[in-house]
């Protein structure tokens, strides 16, 4: 009985502890040249943009973790991220990932991991 009485305050305090919610991962950025394009993946959307075109936005799907990177598949945008050094061919910048994107059936290649 004494043990139960001693444990009740500890249990009551534990019930008041805030629930930990993990922060959202930072957005993922990728870019390409010839033609120029940008990709942003955040917790809500996968957004593909090109100059002089309307952005194509799809809800962010559950990520598929492959042996070499990540895959995101939506009805209009498919993204394959391969971890490995990448150069965009127009600057001296080196990126963390090689990125292949298929948007409405068109293939785009670039670099990501900004």
Regions found by a protein language model. Name each.
Residues 1-16:
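Sec-dependent bacterial lipoprotein signal peptides
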Residues 17-114:
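Cysteine-centric segments in proteins
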């Amino acid at each position: 009985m004494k043990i139960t009485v001693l444990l009740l305050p500890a249990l009551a305090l534990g019930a008041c502890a805030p629930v930990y919610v993990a922060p959202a991962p930072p957005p993922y950025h990728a870019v390409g040249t010839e033609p120029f394009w940008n990709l942003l993946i955040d917790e809500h959307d996968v957004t593909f943009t090109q100059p002089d075109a309307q952005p194509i936005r799809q809800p962010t799907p559950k990520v598929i973790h492959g042996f070499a990177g990540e895959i995101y598949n939506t009805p209009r945008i498919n993204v394959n991220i391969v971890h490995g050094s990448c150069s965009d061919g127009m600057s001296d910048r080196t990126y963390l990932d090689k990125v292949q994107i298929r948007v409405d059936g068109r293939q785009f290649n670039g670099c990501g991991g900004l």
